[in-house]
Amino acid sequence: MASRYDRAITVFSPDGHLFQVEYAQEAVKKGSTAVGIRGTNIVVLGVEKKSVAKLQDERTVRKICALDDHVCMAFAVLTIFIGLTADARVVINRARVECQSHKLTVEDPVTVEYITRFIATLKQKYTQSNGRRPFGISALIVGFDDDGISRLYQTDPSGTYHAWKANAIGRSAKTVREFLEKNYTEDAIASDSEAIKLAIKALLEVVQSGGKNIELAIIRRNQPLKMFSAKEVELYVTEIEKEKEEAEKKKSKKSV
């Protein structure tokens, strides 16, 4: 009896579960860790980079992409299965088409919430249709609207979405989120560089080998998505390490 609810997408179990949706959410928890932070004049996206094959071109393995000139997205997928990475590609392509269609019809760009709601609605439809399965992705969607205010939304495989000041998704989301809850303050995002460093610090809580395993991007108002090179990320990591050393020295002096 239990296996029937386990396999059916559109049938609730007696205790109110949609197991296929819950399995998709578990798949997301095994994906790369991604973090998004709203600054005053900037939004930062950071993603844990998984190691690639020796002969593979790492430029083709991206977790951050632009949906429109003012909206971008990072996603967490179970990268060991290419099918779920392909899920992200389908959602990205649908969202990009919707951005362009909206611009042609209304003659205005989409708002960040509009495209987030579109993606969430698409995901939700795949939780109540026979012959389909839920998308195995969770996404952080960021950008700026005409009012100049930065936005950050998160969606999950069930089709729900929420606005955040800072959030994390993926395998170590809980650890990163706890770090952000302790360290996200107005001072921590007062400048662009401080917001960038906060995102890197959050990822360094769970990422091994420092900056070389971090993919970082920022978006500013009226500016396109900017991807950081590995060298740029390493410079920030070096600066963070120096700040830690100086803080430890000050503590040791006080204790003496």
Swiss-Prot record:
Recorded GO CC terms: cytoplasm; extracellular exosome; nucleus; proteasome core complex, alpha-subunit complex; spermatoproteasome complex
Nucleus is among the record's keywords: yes
Lineage, broadest ranks: Eukaryota, Metazoa, Chordata, Craniata, Vertebrata
Protein family per UniProt: Belongs to the peptidase T1A family.
Localisation per UniProt entry: Nucleus
Organism from which the protein derives: Homo sapiens
Classification via CDD domains: proteasome_alpha_type_7
PROSITE patterns hit by this protein: PROTEASOME_ALPHA_1, PROTEASOME_ALPHA_2
Pfam families: Proteasome, Proteasome_A_N
Self-association and partners: Component of the outer alpha-ring of the 20S proteasome core which is composed of 28 subunits that are arranged in four stacked rings, resulting in a barrel-shaped structure. The catalytic chamber with the active sites is on the inside of the barrel. Interacts with canonical subunits of the spermatoproteasome, including proteasome activators PSME4 (also called PA200) and PSME3 (also called PA28-gamma). Interacts with proteasome-interacting proteins chaperones, ubiquitin ligases and ubiquitin specific proteases.
Keywords, sorted A to Z: Differentiation, Nucleus, Proteasome, Spermatogenesis
Protein's name according to its UniProt entry: Proteasome subunit alpha-type 8
GO biological process: cell differentiation; meiotic cell cycle; proteasomal protein catabolic process; proteasome-mediated ubiquitin-dependent protein catabolic process; regulation of meiosis I; spermatogenesis
Functional description taken from the UniProt entry: Component of the spermatoproteasome, a proteasome specifically found in testis that promotes acetylation-dependent degradation of histones, thereby participating actively to the exchange of histones during spermatogenesis. The proteasome is a protein complex that degrades unneeded or damaged proteins by proteolysis, a chemical reaction that breaks peptide bonds. Required for 20S core proteasome assembly, essential for the degradation of meiotic proteins RAD51 and RPA1 at late prophase I and the progression of meiosis I during spermatogenesis.
